[in-house]
């Protein structure tokens, strides 16, 4: 399942990232923020209108905002 399918207060482990579907700059930023295979992420909040964009994710001690289109490139297993 990809990260965009998880609801609030869900914790998952990243098992794969489709780096090819992301622009080079986007991929670099996500890696710098700790988004990579093996990382544990929690969905803290989702937008409330229409596309429910963006997602607020907790990775370690950081909370980041991620667009749904980018979250679709991140495959996770529920913890």
Regions found by a protein language model. Give the residues of each.
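Cytosolic, membrane-proximal regulatory domains of ion/volume homeostasis and mechanosensation machinery
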Residues: 1-3, 77
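C-terminal structural segments of small proteins and small subunits
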Residues: 10-11, 48-79
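Exposed beta-strand/loop interface patches that mediate assembly or binding
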Residues: 13-17, 21
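Short alpha-helix capping/helix-loop boundary micro-motifs
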Residues: 23-29, 50
């Amino acid at each position: 399942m990809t990260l965009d399918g998880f609801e609030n207060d869900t914790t998952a482990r990243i098992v794969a990232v489709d780096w090819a579907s992301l622009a080079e700059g986007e991929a670099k930023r996500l890696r710098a923020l700790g988004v990579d295979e093996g990382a544990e992420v929690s969905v803290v909040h989702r937008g409330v209108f229409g596309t429910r964009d963006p997602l607020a994710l907790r990775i370690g001690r950081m909370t980041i905002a991620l667009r749904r289109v980018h979250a679709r490139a991140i495959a996770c297993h529920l913890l």
